[in-house]
């Protein structure tokens, strides 16, 4: 399902719970709501901004409840300042919606009465265990023996409890429980801060019997209603809470970490749209640093270090930030015969002096991209058309005056020559339409390629990739204006030596598979050429 990071502090906190001791922001009486420091990753940090919530708006703290709770803290391990909590249930808040019922027989009205407007709630959820889901309307929250308990002012505002087995993408629908908004006041549609009344609460409690490990686990979705000018209603999610080991955690979104692979592909004319996982500053390294309190995951480690000393605004929303949080994902190293499976373990890195890949990586694990750990391997977009296949012919003279190291295709020419030397000059093939119109091939050039039959064949399964040549001259292209050229008249360009990539082999007992060269979209200063056999 997911992982939640929490800090563990040694000792037991004793709080005197009184009826009139209510926490809310802003506080009714004068005094400090926050301390002068905070703990993260097992280290203590001073608060540069007084009375500031580090992970969001200060008003978000009102969703945690107005009364303090008493619970013990587990003594942390010396080498594990951060504990990973497992989330067994997750309600997809974006899937929450209202379904209206228009059956007049179910909503009779008398003269002078308001017409009844009946709605029901539907949503999608994931569960790694058996769960029991209950809906509460106009409910207040209380903690009893470490468990979150919700109560409604009217029993008719509480639905029956529905039990589900474990599964992913399960649909919740309960037509028997209908919400009649004709009986609601306008101020009851929104969250009442003074009385602590939530318009609607969806509670999913793990129901695994006497299993001690999951006792007290629950997921809570808080939502409100909106009334439109046409008289219709809609539901708006407010916050989500996760109760793990009888401790309530407020969930906050991280912007820029969503799974873009599962979204529908929409054509866009904006090529610079933010649809990748690279850092928004350098556009090369992967994002792994979170900006607080705006919660934008948009920076890599090196750019985050630069931003700490040169600016104090988020590059996305331009709001001032108070902390930078690096989130690192690791996975277990696969065995020799075991398939690769993603088992992300999130770890925070607060050391800004060392950023090597081996920092804070447990033994037996290897660091991976955070987005790949949560969303899986990134698939190639099907909207990108495949480039035509070409074969390249060896040539000489183009790198006169240049060293061997400045010609990245030098080691590539021998392999390509070996794959083509068996071919003979042939007439126009059916797939000759793939031939570039600006690259005429001469018969004498093709005859010279077949003069060396003793060269060894390329090994099977060879795959070579060349990345970003240091000498753009070796990749320069020229337009050929004349239909034919005399051999030796001038140095041929790379366009002059491209030909069709499907030669037929004759006079060979075992046919050799052709070498395919795919050419992606080439920029003016760099080139990426791959050979796959």
From Swiss-Prot:
It is an enzyme of class 2 (transferase). Residues 423-439 have a biased composition (Polar residues). It is found in: Cytoplasm, Cytosol; Cell membrane; Early endosome. Pathway: Protein modification; protein ubiquitination. A motif (Required for TSG101-binding) lies at residues 385-388. InterPro entries: MGRN1/RNF157-like (IPR045194), Znf_RING (IPR001841), Znf_RING/FYVE/PHD (IPR013083). Interacts with MC1R and MC4R. Interacts with TSG101. Interacts with mislocalized cytosolically exposed PRNP; this interaction alters MGRN1 subcellular location and causes lysosomal enlargement. This is E3 ubiquitin-protein ligase MGRN1. It comes from Rattus norvegicus.
